[in-house]
């Protein structure tokens, strides 16, 4: 969606319950939150549509990925070399992002009820 859509959050909201799978990755295929993807907008949209399923994460690094695959996928940088640390970071990043989006949505709902 990042390539095809001008507003990923809006695209997620528009697709709504038609979404069956969420697959994310950073713009440079490294650690989430260190590139230029607007994950806050993505998490806000996922909360808005009631997404309550898995979020899959993908990342590549020349230190880990097979050399032939690195060439075929145009990976030329070593952005990480510890699978476990990367996976832990991704899980925490997604969980925190969804929790933050949920809290924001609740605050908006409360503001509308009291306003």
Question: Which residues does each predicted region cover?
Answer:
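Histidine-acidic metal/acid-base catalytic patches
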Residues: 1-115
């Amino acid at each position: 969606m990042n390539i095809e859509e001008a507003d990923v959050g809006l695209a997620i909201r528009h697709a709504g319950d038609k979404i069956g799978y969420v697959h994310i990755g950073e713009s440079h295929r490294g650690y989430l939150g260190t590139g230029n993807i607007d994950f806050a907008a993505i998490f806000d949209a996922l909360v808005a549509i009631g997404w309550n399923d898995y979020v899959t994460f993908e990342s590549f690094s020349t230190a880990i990925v097979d050399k032939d695959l690195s060439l075929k996928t145009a990976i030329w940088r070593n952005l990480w070399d510890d699978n476990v640390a990367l996976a832990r970071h991704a899980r925490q990043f997604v969980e925190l992002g969804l929790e933050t989006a949920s809290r924001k949505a609740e605050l908006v709902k409360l503001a509308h009820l009291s306003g």
